[in-house]
């Protein structure tokens, strides 16, 4: 398979995270394309755009493509007009969506929003959420569990940790707590206000399979308790009884992706906020 080379110029007036994410999603559809990404972040003026265009011009004999998420209309038009002059393919991502929403609702977009401050705040909030979630994995640091947005409870190997991490990247502070059969549940979650607690469960046979694979991966196949069918079934049953006693929403993660599980959790979270 012959690879086609593409210089992808990603231009943003902020960190560039959005345009990078969109570009990566699009490029997944082209296995025959070898891409070199040039990320131009925090572009605020025409002089910066001129420098970008100079750099692209140096590679005029190659394939170049510009994608931008510049929100300022005049600056975006300046980039677009110059790309047209230089015959460089150009696509703005956000402007079309903003225009369609504006047209559909028959309202003008807000011109004087401090978008950079908002984006920076979102970034730091996400970092804070990630740090919190990492430090509250598997029942750690429960002394400040009241600072969590979401709490996941479930038996071992029910995807609590990866789900927590995924949610953290979405900006949610997540704590996850293991349920262990025969051990009294040691956290009083009933007294917490405005916190979503989710009970995570899974099909018995699927959990046995996952646990056996885990034991094999760590060369501990002699462990006849961790994946014992009777023990696993008892463990799940006790966990589900705890969930029901506390009226926690229960999510069955059997054959579900982390993204699917997380989307369901976010729906529960938004519903909780709307009720409050």
Curated annotation (Swiss-Prot):
E.C. no: 2.7.11.32, 2.7.4.27
InterPro entries linked to this entry: Kinase-pyrophosphorylase, P-loop_NTPase, PPDK_reg
Gene Ontology molecular function: any one: phosphotransferase activity, phosphate group as acceptor
Keyword field: Kinase, Nucleotide-binding, Serine/threonine-protein kinase, Transferase
Catalyzed reaction equations: N(tele)-phospho-L-histidyl/L-threonyl-[pyruvate, phosphate dikinase] + ADP = N(tele)-phospho-L-histidyl/O-phospho-L-threonyl-[pyruvate, phosphate dikinase] + AMP + H(+); N(tele)-phospho-L-histidyl/O-phospho-L-threonyl-[pyruvate, phosphate dikinase] + phosphate + H(+) = N(tele)-phospho-L-histidyl/L-threonyl-[pyruvate, phosphate dikinase] + diphosphate
One Pfam family from the record: Kinase-PPPase
Annotated binding of ADP, by residue: 154-161
Signal peptide limits: none
Function (record text): Bifunctional serine/threonine kinase and phosphorylase involved in the regulation of the pyruvate, phosphate dikinase (PPDK) by catalyzing its phosphorylation/dephosphorylation.
NCBIfam families listed in its UniProt record: PRK05339.1 (NF003742)
Similarity annotation: Belongs to the pyruvate, phosphate/water dikinase regulatory protein family. PDRP subfamily.
Protein known as: Putative pyruvate, phosphate dikinase regulatory protein
Source organism: Wolbachia sp. subsp. Drosophila simulans (strain wRi)
């Amino acid at each position: 398979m012959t690879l086609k080379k593409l210089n992808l110029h990603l231009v943003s007036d902020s960190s560039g995270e959005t345009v990078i994410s969109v570009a990566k999603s699009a490029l997944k559809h082209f296995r025959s394309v070898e891409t070199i990404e040039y990320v131009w972040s925090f572009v605020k003026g025409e002089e910066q755009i001129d420098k970008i265009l100079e750099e692209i011009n140096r590679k005029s004999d190659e394939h170049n493509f510009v994608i931008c998420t510049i929100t300022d209309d005049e600056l975006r038009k300046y980039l677009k007009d110059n790309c047209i002059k230089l015959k460089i393919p150009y696509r703005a991502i956000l402007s079309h969506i903003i225009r369609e929403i504006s047209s559909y609702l028959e309202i003008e977009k807000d011109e004087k929003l401090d978008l950079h401050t908002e984006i920076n705040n979102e970034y730091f909030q996400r970092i804070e959420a990630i740090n919190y979630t990492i430090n509250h994995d598997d029942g750690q640091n429960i002394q400040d569990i009241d600072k969590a947005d979401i709490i996941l409870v479930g038996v071992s190997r029910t995807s609590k940790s990866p789900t927590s991490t995924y949610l953290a990247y979405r900006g949610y502070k997540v704590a996850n707590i293991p349920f262990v059969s025969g051990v009294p549940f040691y956290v009083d979650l009933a007294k917490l206000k405005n916190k979503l607690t989710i009970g995570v469960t899974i099909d018995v046979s699927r959990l046995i399979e996952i646990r056996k694979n885990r034991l094999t991966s760590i060369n501990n196949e002699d462990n006849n308790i961790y994946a014992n069918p009777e023990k696993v079934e008892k463990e799940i049953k006790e966990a589900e009884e705890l969930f029901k006693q506390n009226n926690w929403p229960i999510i069955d993660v059997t054959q579900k992706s982390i993204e699917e599980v997380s989307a369901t959790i976010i729906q529960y979270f938004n519903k909780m906020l709307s009720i409050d």
